[in-house]
């Protein structure tokens, strides 16, 4: 199919390599663990019409591998399909019916899901059961150039766990790595017992678990719910404030409420290169997406 090119935005191999250097390896300081598992050639045929070329390029570049001592991973969407099915079962997401794939995840199992229509518009927090949509990402996927950008940023602004140890204040995933070692490609750190049964977030409660069966079981024991679309909510509040101040006319809203701001293809509008607060941004897989 080939990369989509635009005179102002080019997301070919050179641009992706720059993002890898400046974002993934530079700003985020997340080098790969080593040589990743090679992505099977049939995956490029299966997903060639699903993911933009930027995603397929990164697959060829890295394979399925972990970054930053296993804090973030590029996942095999076929192997992780049972996990996705378990976490989305019974949840009505605000997007057209489509197949969802896990493309990145963290040491604790926090997942980014890519819809075959809506792109990487869902994040799943397996700790608190939140499935969080992003309508701004889904809307940008209609633009082929922005879709290439979204694909690039999804992998070069890596997803990270958001939870800190309630005693030490340090990232609980980092404490898990220090105590248990780097998790493998088929492993996650899980709380024992799961936090859905109560207790504090503490690194000494973590153990190494087989990722797929553990997360499928966790989906069955953890209350799951659709979270707030933060960018849409923020955009609506910001627009209403401007209307109240008389800065913009009320006609800028629609019958469904004020429109959200344009995030120009950033999966999270996060800090980091390409995000709103990063050195290359206009203001990622970062949890920071």
Predicted regions and their residues:
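A surface-exposed partner-binding patch
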Residues: 2-122, 189-257
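Compact, glycine/acidic-enriched structural inserts
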Residues: 122-165
